[in-house]
């Protein structure tokens, strides 16, 4: 059952909430800077060569490590979402209000965009790689890929961070979240690009002024994140969690 709560303007503009938005902006900026930067670095080291297995592994590891750090540094302030699909999945389960979640989205998208604009500046205007489905993969297939891998990501967030029964498992949440993202990039990278994160795809699109196919990385991740929130919230949390009221974020 969907547990969306709209929330109040007062709560969404409280000092605590504003600190959370700043934390999301900074953490998303750091994550995207390292993730996209690793792809640019691969191109620099290979003189623009095609992505090979070693390059894919390196980029996946860079994303996993950067997300681990990003979630860790923001967790105590904002919950460490760094991803509109994660925020949406948590909103579906009643862990963050819709209004506060929208401001999380703004912070995440701004952080990703600033990261990519900074990369463009510090690399002397090098092309910013954007997400896109590979040749032989249709956009519909890309959407399905993104649904599945984002479901895995948000399900992991629920199991390790949002579930009130998590206990000591919560201490490894950033590691588990980073690992699943790295693994999913290895699995889906050659096909859909392995985004799982609308902000991660939006930032490069802004810097490159190229939004071709960007819808894939909104539709797929939001469906996957929402489904994970529904499934985990109803099946494994059920009535043991009170719907968000005064609490604004996970």
From Swiss-Prot:
CDD domains to which the protein is assigned, alphabetical: MIP
Residue ranges the record marks as coiled coil: none
Keyword Transmembrane helix attributed: yes
Keyword match Lyase: no
Pfam hit, one: MIP
GO MF annotation terms: water channel activity
Chain ranges for the short sequence motif NPA 1 as given in the UniProt record: 83-85
Superkingdom of source: Eukaryota
SUPFAM superfamilies the record matches: Aquaporin-like
A cellular-component GO term for this protein: protein storage vacuole membrane
Transmembrane segments annotated in the record for this chain: 22-42, 54-74, 97-119, 142-162, 169-189, 218-238
Keywords: Membrane, Repeat, Transmembrane, Transmembrane helix, Transport, Vacuole
Localization per Swiss-Prot or TrEMBL: Vacuole membrane
Topology within the bilayer: Multi-pass membrane protein
One GO biological process term: water transport
Location of the motif NPA 2: 197-199
InterPro entries documented for this protein: Aquaporin-like, Aquaporin_transptr, MIP, MIP_CS
Recorded domain comment: Aquaporins contain two tandem repeats each containing three membrane-spanning domains and a pore-forming loop with the signature motif Asn-Pro-Ala (NPA).
Family label: Belongs to the MIP/aquaporin (TC 1.A.8) family. TIP (TC 1.A.8.10) subfamily.
Function noted in UniProt: Aquaporins facilitate the transport of water and small neutral solutes across cell membranes.
Descriptive protein name: Aquaporin TIP2-2
